[in-house]
């Protein structure tokens, strides 16, 4: 699972997921999976989608993961009263804004890439679309 090796602080504020994304262009591969909606992806969801894509292309070509879960999410244990401090870090998430390229792929035909991204998109909680690299 993806998570930072070390962070400056163990826990962070909840914050808000506003604004537009950085990294909106396909830059490494030829095809990409771009987020249309806004939300957050857990490390498990990112890994599940990656596995689905890898199996679909039968380990051909190359896949790039363009998102990294760098925000810790805390939870308090079951049946614990409110207060007494912030809970423990349970999992890590990546905040996603519309337009962010989540995955990229190269070295496979377009039809196979579309099918692989369709399988990956089913594992994700946000709406996505298929994009190709624009050559100027």
Swiss-Prot record:
CDD domains: Ribosomal_L16_L10e
Signal peptide residue numbers: none
Pfam families: Ribosomal_L16
Keyword line: Ribonucleoprotein, Ribosomal protein, RNA-binding, rRNA-binding, tRNA-binding
Gene Ontology cellular component terms for the protein in this record: cytosolic large ribosomal subunit
Gene Ontology molecular function, alphabetical: rRNA binding; structural constituent of ribosome; tRNA binding
GO biological process, one term: translation
Subunit structure: Part of the 50S ribosomal subunit.
Function as written in the Swiss-Prot or TrEMBL entry: Binds 23S rRNA and is also seen to make contacts with the A and possibly P site tRNAs.
Family: Belongs to the universal ribosomal protein uL16 family.
Protein name in the entry: Large ribosomal subunit protein uL16
Organism: Edwardsiella ictaluri (strain 93-146)
Gene field: rplP
């Amino acid at each position: 699972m993806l998570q930072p090796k070390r962070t400056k602080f163990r826990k962070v504020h909840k914050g808000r997921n506003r604004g537009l994304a950085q990294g909106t262009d396909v830059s490494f591969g030829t095809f990409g999976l771009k987020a249309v909606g806004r939300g957050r992806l857990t490390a498990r969801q990112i890994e599940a989608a990656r596995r689905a894509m890898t199996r679909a292309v039968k380990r051909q070509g190359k896949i790039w993961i363009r998102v990294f879960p760098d925000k810790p999410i805390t939870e308090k244990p079951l049946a614990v009263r409110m207060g007494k401090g912030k809970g423990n870090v349970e999992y890590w998430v990546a905040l996603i804004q519309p337009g962010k390229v989540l995955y990229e792929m190269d070295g496979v035909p377009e039809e196979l890439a579309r099918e692989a991204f369709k399988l990956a998109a089913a594992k994700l909680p946000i709406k996505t679309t298929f994009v190709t690299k624009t050559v100027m």
